[in-house]
Amino acid sequence: MNKILVAYDGGDPARRALETAAELAKLTGASVAVVSVVPTHPGRFPVDPSDDTSVHAQELLEARRMLREKGIEAELIEPTGDPAPTIERIADEGGYDTVVIGSRGLNAMGRILQGSVSEHVATHSKATVVVAR
């Protein structure tokens, strides 16, 4: 394990993913990057992605602070797009061998209606995917 990508959105599942990534990095000496995707919202009305940028920037800074408290430096990545395929693309193009992502614990209906980012990444990424619960 050389490169860990952790998906982070500030929620409790993402915090658990960050903790898991920190533990793995300490055990293996792997480098860590944190990605927080600014989602684009398809629909009838255009949404300005810059509206979400400051929120995601704050989430990334929070993640960096949490990792620094554990003695880990991290690269911060803030792309825009659909979160699931964007995380998958960054992991694959960046050569990350491990992706750590939180699980929201959606029930079957929630997965059908909303989709599951962790399920998509685990199914499609070339990297090993660790789902923190």
Predicted regions and their residues:
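Aromatic/hydrophobic pocket-lining residues that form π-stacking "cages" and hydrophobic walls in ligand
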Residues: 17, 21, 63, 87, ...
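Conserved beta-strand positions in the Rossmann-like core of class I SAM-dependent methyltransferases
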Residues: 33, 75, 130
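Generic structural signal for helix capping and beta-alpha/helix-loop junctions
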Residues: 41-42, 84, 108
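Short, surface-exposed alpha-helical segments at coil->helix boundaries
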Residues: 50-61
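Class I S-adenosyl-L-methionine
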Residues: 61-68
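Gly/Ser-rich helix-loop-strand patches that form or flank binding pockets
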Residues: 89-133
